[in-house]
Amino acid sequence: MHASVRVPRHVGIIMDGNGRWAKGRNRPHSFGHRAGVRAIKRVMYGCEDLGIEVLSVYAFSTENWTRPRTEVRALMRLFHETLEREFDEIHSRGIRIVVSGRRGELSPRMRERIDDAERKTAQNPNGTLNVCLNYGGRAELVDAVRSLIESGVSAAEIDEKALAARLYQPQLPDVDLIIRTAGESRMSNFMLWRATYAEIFITDTLWPDFDVPDLERAISDYQGRVRRFGGRPEPAEPLELSS
């Protein structure tokens, strides 16, 4: 990776492969999810060291409720335990915690823990961990539109800026780089608004095995791309040959 070249401000990760990782070791899915939490911690601190401002991790989607009830319960318990266990260290390193998603379907205990973590870390200056929990890109847009309607905004006043201001975490910048693990090549309803012009990096590495060197490879690939944002770079001026 070229340290002197730009790094993305906002990296989003679709963490895939926990179940396959556990199955390959003849262990239950919960074993893979716990290993996946350790990977989040490694990558979060790697982003901090590299100067990446925001890391968004796709922890639980609005569609994940259709998984077996025992797995959903185990995941929710793991989220709460992880926030309890890791909070002090994350806070001491100056990392801000925010959560994107529909909170109404989470337990009161979980909502209280999230609110507490967001409040206590709100002024932390060393980057942001955005946990996408009960999150869906379509749900985020639906909720943003509902918020606009409820606020009494007229149709003539609705534009991209107005809609963006109603997203779950409107202060966050657009996603520059999306990393998807386990070789899958779908967006899976992740960050549909913010990732409009994100670069995408796909790796066969299963999420529990993903580490800082994998992150650095993804960023190195990102650094080699030309980001056009729908436009086209100006052609180089023709050389004037002396007669």
Language-model segments: which ranges?
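Flexible, compositionally biased loop and terminal segments
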Residues: 1-243
